[in-house]
Amino acid sequence: MAINLQKPDITELKPRITVFGVGGGGGNAVNNMITAGLQGVDFVVANTDAQALTMTKAERIIQMGVAVTEGLGAGSQPEVGRAAAEECIDEIIDHLQGTHMCFVTAGMGGGTGTGAAPIVAQAARNKGILTVGVVTKPFHFEGGRRMRIADQGISDLQKSVDTLIVIPNQNLFRIANDKTTFADAFAMADQVLYSGVACITDLMVKEGLINLDFADVRSVMREMGRAMMGTGEASGEGRAMAAAEAAIANPLLDETSMKGAQGLLISITGGRDLTLFEVDEAATRIREEVDPDANIILGATFDEELEGLIRVSVVATGIDRTAAEVAGRSADFRPVAPKPIVRPSAAVPAQPQPTVSLQPVPQPQPVQQPLQQQNVDHIALAIREAEMERELDIAARAQVAAPAPQPQPHLQEEAFRPQSKLFAGVAPTEAAPVMRPAQPAPRPVEMQAPVQPQMQAQPVQQEPTQVVRQQAEPVRMPKVEDFPPVVKAEMDYRTQPAPAHQEERGPMGLLNRITSSLGLREREATNVSSDMTAAAPSAASQQRRPLSPEASLYAPRRGQLDDHGRAAPQMRSHEDDQLEIPAFLRRQSS
């Protein structure tokens, strides 16, 4: 019986770091890092330009936007680069499988790097991968439009990465001279990315007295915002201090400073001659630049190739975190503070004004409020006036017995003052038709009442006495004694002479009738003259009274009197005489 013994497969557990180059600038950075011999890192290049992919040194490439760009590039349009990345998002995720840390590098200002880099970074971050962005900004001679596109791309990328490092190409002039070639200048910019990645990989892979694991690196770089990377080398006396100063003052970074950094990763590498005092001197100098409460992680490793040299690498994160939090709080506080102050102040003065004007008149409030709100709507105003006329008719009748007159009720009584005179000589049945034509008169008064309630209150208070005097006249009805003296004389004449005249008619002869008729004429003439003399003073006093046109129209008619107050029965008595005297006797008398 054979026994098969096999060696168990041991899965090597180590952090996997991927450098993802996007666009032309990212592909060039990857080529420079591969040429420098960076070990322990996987390289992936993605681009929309098929020709650029043929010149890359990376083994894993992604042709983005085959259907969108057909391999011709994005044409400096970030929208095209974004669409190309979204088209092959599944392939991007496959290349990120099993990655623990991803460096997304690109050149901002173009089409593919500016548009596709945020998509790649967001895909990596969604998988829980620690994502670090390292991008470059264009030169000033490339134009303002390209710079604005780059700034917008950096703003979008910062939302998708944990830590972002920005390297302006314009800063290359600080370290370049007239002999520096164009390719060498870009290689210097790529050295920043190379030193940062090498710093992290050396701490986790190479042998050393103070080794670091990937969890330490993740705690320093997770969601830290803007960051800076720097590396310095020195030899001879004071090499530790010189290397630390060179690492702190990196001339290629985007005007950043380590002041106030929340996370700090320090890597000190040297040969076997590295001393304890040199490590302390370098670490102390770097620690002075950051926040006292910053999370500082220090690692020291040995490299046989660095005999007589010391290399100090620094990764400072959370540089703008404190400033951003303070600015965000202040920005949130400023717009919110004035809002609750402005709204109550604008609403407080508007509320007491309508309440004060409406409190003294509780009943007409529903009538006044629609007039103020519907001044422009003439149709609604006419409807409201018709409703007011109906209410005024009811209010005029109900306010006769009201104990305490108010400003608005007085306005209604004043409007009906010319109508109150008509009740002196007109029956109650005639009051209704008289009030209807007089109602349009108070319309302008009612329209002005809600606009200026205070100005109308003064004349209204002077009217109550006049209204009471005018309403007292209808109580006294006309009697017989109020008739003119001419009418009284006529009434007396009808009562007294009638029986005497009837007594003489029966047995009277023809001659007596003639004489009696002549005497009757003389008596009537004397009576009329006496009545005229008696009625003269009374008629004069009657004419002195100011009679209104309404009273003259509705005064009792004098159907039996003429314009001079003479009695109409004279004509009747004369006619009676003409009827009583025969025709032949009338001829004889003539």
Swiss-Prot record:
- Which residues are GTP-binding? G24, G25, G26, G27, N28, G111, T112, G113, E142, R146, D190
Q: Identify the GO cellular component terms for this protein.
A: cell division site; cytoplasm
Q: Where does it reside? A: Cytoplasm
Instruction: Give any single GO term for biological process.
Output: FtsZ-dependent cytokinesis
Positions of region (Disordered): 346-372, 524-590
- Give the compositionally biased regions (Basic and acidic residues): 559-576
Q: Where is the composition biased (Low complexity)?
A: 534-546
Chief place of localization: cytoplasm
Q: Which SMART domains match?
A: Tubulin, Tubulin_C
Database matches in InterPro entries: Cell_div_FtsZ, Cell_div_FtsZ_C, Cell_div_FtsZ_CS, FtsZ/CetZ, FtsZ_C, Tub_FtsZ_C, Tubulin/FtsZ-like_C, Tubulin/FtsZ_2-layer-sand-dom
Q: Which domain of life is it from?
A: Bacteria
Q: Which UniProt keywords apply?
A: Cell cycle, Cell division, Cytoplasm, GTP-binding, Nucleotide-binding, Septation
- Please provide, alphabetically and separated by semicolons, the GO molecular function terms listed in this UniProt record: GTP binding; GTPase activity
Role according to the record: Essential cell division protein that forms a contractile ring structure (Z ring) at the future cell division site. The regulation of the ring assembly controls the timing and the location of cell division. One of the functions of the FtsZ ring is to recruit other cell division proteins to the septum to produce a new cell wall between the dividing cells. Binds GTP and shows GTPase activity.
Name the family: Belongs to the FtsZ family.
Question: Subunit details for this protein?
Answer: Homodimer. Polymerizes to form a dynamic ring structure in a strictly GTP-dependent manner. Interacts directly with several other division proteins.
Q: What is this protein called?
A: Cell division protein FtsZ 1
Name the source organism. Answer: Rhizobium meliloti (strain 1021) (Ensifer meliloti)
